[in-house]
Amino acid sequence: EAVEDLAAVIDTIKDQRDIRGMTIRGKGGFFCAGGDLKGFNAMASGATEESMRMSRRIGHVLAELNALPQVTVAVIEGAAMAGGLGVACCCDVTIGMSDAKFGFSETRIGITPAQIARYVLQKCGYSTGRRLMVTAARFKGDEAGRLGVLDFVAEDAHALANLEAKVKRDVLECAPGAVAACKELIIGMPATPDSEKVEFAAMNFSGCLQGEEGKEGVASFVEKRKPNWHTEI
């Protein structure tokens, strides 16, 4: 159900450039404990196609979240485990409490972090991500910051709110179309053959520079004024 709710939100906002970002946080001070183990238990004795269909669906939603044109922010309180932490790794910015609990716990129950693995490696690097997933290590927010799982670590609720507000202010200073193009560049570059990387980057840059936002951004800098997309909160 949570996966379908997330998919519905993504589908609603992905083409709306007036929506500048999306924040994901848990209800009641708890981010996400991961998948439905009772459902997994029933599925373990069912048809192979059923479990594969479920995994594919999760994979497609995570891919859409990762590529969402808007800036995505995960605010983590309580705990973020397994697939829930994988969702956070798809986000552009991760903020969490120092006492929150983290872990990619799949191998402890005999399964793999299949659909989230590439996003874990994307977030905290190959060596660290590999160790965390293979050993199902558990760690707190302070260590999550050192490992690169969290971008910002807060000691209390007030600090968490301030960090979230700071990220929102930064986002609202950025051109929404340029943000979308930047994410296309970041996601597309690794899969682009080396012989095509220069051309891919040049087209991305030129498309932005000669677009309405590029013209407005350069003009606003020269004229020493704020661009028309700048919004304050």
Stretch-by-stretch model annotation:
Residues 1-27, 49, 60-63, 166, ...:
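Conserved CoA-thioester-binding segment of acyl-CoA-metabolizing enzymes
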Residues 42-56:
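A short acidic, glycine-rich active-site loop
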Residues 61-109, 138-141:
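Glycine-rich beta-to-alpha active-site loop
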Residues 34-35, 128-137:
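Short helix- or helix-capping micro-motifs
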Residues 118-127:
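Hydrophobic, secondary-structure "cap" segments at the distal end of domains
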Residues 95-100, 150-199, 212, 228-233:
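C-terminal long alpha-helix characteristic of the crotonase
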